[in-house]
Amino acid sequence: MSKESKDNKDDSPAPAGLDKRDWIAGLERGVSIIEAFDDANPRLTASQAGQRTNMTRTAARRYLLTLQHMGYVASDGKLFWLTPRVLRLGRSYLESARLPRVVQPFLQRVAAGTNEIAYLSVMDGDEVVYIARNGPNRSMSTGYVLGARVPAQVTASGMLMLALRSDAELNEWLATRQLTVFTSHTIASMERMKLELARIRAQGWALSEQQLDLNSRGIAVPLRDRHGTLVGALNITMPMGHESSEDAVARVLPVLRETAQAMRNLI
């Protein structure tokens, strides 16, 4: 059988724990085509899409043309790019998931108590995704938009959720990742990262300053459900201004902690 024929059959192995009969490889490949586009690769040829998804050019082209017919992809005949219709997929999550809706009144409480933008964020792979936010009107045009994805290693919420992983999960992450440097303040060595994550785990909250953007500060606390399971992080981002780290923590941390505790029995 040719590689092209294989690419168009659902014959790839199912993930561990999923019966082969319940696995639709074509759906997995279609999603992987959408995920092949990113900041560094906003437009792709069929060959490039195939290389990024481990498909042949012919198979990638068929998925791209199918997505184009569905309205998720546009093309000039050579290059392909995502259309705004893709945002419907993320919007479906934000509108159907219970957590972003439940958290809104509490984010409003944090924003009112701190005069800063408050967020709920979750982990997806090595990134933090912001799934809810609330803040003063003067600030809502700044900060992270809903659905924004940021490397976990440089955010307070991301470092917090990394620190609260099991020892095995955290050690695996530390052993298999490379740190990206964004500013002169970014933690660039795994030894220093390991020490910082240990400190965060011990104190139960995280502070990150100027690791992704200069003059930006983040403070985060864990958000747990009634069973104690970590479901995300409640966090504030703010410009550093003239407020010291100690003063910012003293002002914001109690509000974050009280709000996270109040939410615990509702999620």
Where do the model's predicted regions map?
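Short, solvent-exposed recognition segments
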Residues: 2-11, 139-212
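Juxtadomain coupling helices with adjacent low-complexity linkers
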Residues: 214-215, 231-267
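Short hydrophobic beta-strand micro-motif common in sensory/regulatory domains
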Residues: 217-221
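N-terminal helix-turn-helix
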Residues: 2-101, 261-266
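Amphipathic alpha-helical effector-binding/dimerization core
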Residues: 82-177
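Sensor-regulatory modules in signal-transduction proteins
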Residues: 223-226
